[in-house]
């Protein structure tokens, strides 16, 4: 039996490319999908409220919520943290609180999450983390 995958943040830069490659991926986000995508869509009202996922069947997550608009992010000192770290932290807390069994969470971000002073290449998930703005 194939694992069900959800993609959170489907309307940004990478989301549509993933969804076009695999119509079975369930899209989860605040904004509706473009009309050329046939993936099923689940709306969430906020990038910090994942309760609409409570009754969904999924084992894998592609997490794409974030922002790389450097002009806006540089003008608002805390916005990069809010857009690129809080949503992921909230989602991981949601998974823990609901005791959801997940095979993988793949996160794409514009922020460096690993400690740049301790990072070793190639980088894996066991590297020391130190997200910074």
Predicted regions and their residues:
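Rossmann-fold cofactor-recognition segment
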Residues: 32-49
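Glycine-rich NAD(P)-binding loop of the Rossmann-fold in SDR/ketoreductase-type enzymes
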Residues: 76-90, 129, 133
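Conserved glycine-rich Rossmann-like NAD(P)H-binding loop of the short-chain dehydrogenase/reductase
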Residues: 24-34
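N-terminal Rossmann NAD(P)H-binding glycine-rich loop of SDR-like oxidoreductase domains
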Residues: 2-23
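SDR active-site strand-loop-helix element
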Residues: 8, 28, 61-65, 105-111
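Glycine/Thr-rich phosphate-binding loops of Rossmann-like dinucleotide-binding domains
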Residues: 15, 71, 115-116
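Conserved Rossmann-fold NAD(P)-dependent oxidoreductase catalytic core, especially the SDR/UDP-sugar
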Residues: 89-130
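NAD(P)H-binding glycine-rich loop region in Rossmannoid oxidoreductase-like domains
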Residues: 44-83
């Amino acid at each position: 039996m194939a694992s069900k995958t959800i993609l959170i943040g489907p309307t940004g830069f990478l989301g549509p490319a993933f969804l076009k490659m695999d119509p079975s991926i369930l899209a989860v986000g605040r904004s509706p999908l473009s009309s050329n995508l046939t993936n099923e869509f689940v709306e969430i009202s906020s990038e910090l409220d994942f309760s609409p996922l409570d009754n969904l069947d999924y084992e894998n997550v592609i997490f794409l919520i974030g922002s790389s608009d450097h002009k806006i992010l540089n003008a608002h000192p805390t916005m990069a943290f809010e857009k690129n770290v809080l949503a992921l932290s909230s989602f991981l807390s949601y998974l823990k609180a609901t005791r959801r069994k997940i095979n993988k969470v793949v996160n794409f971000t514009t922020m460096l999450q690993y400690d740049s002073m301790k990072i070793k290449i190639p980088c894996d998930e066991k590297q020391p983390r130190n997200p910074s703005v």
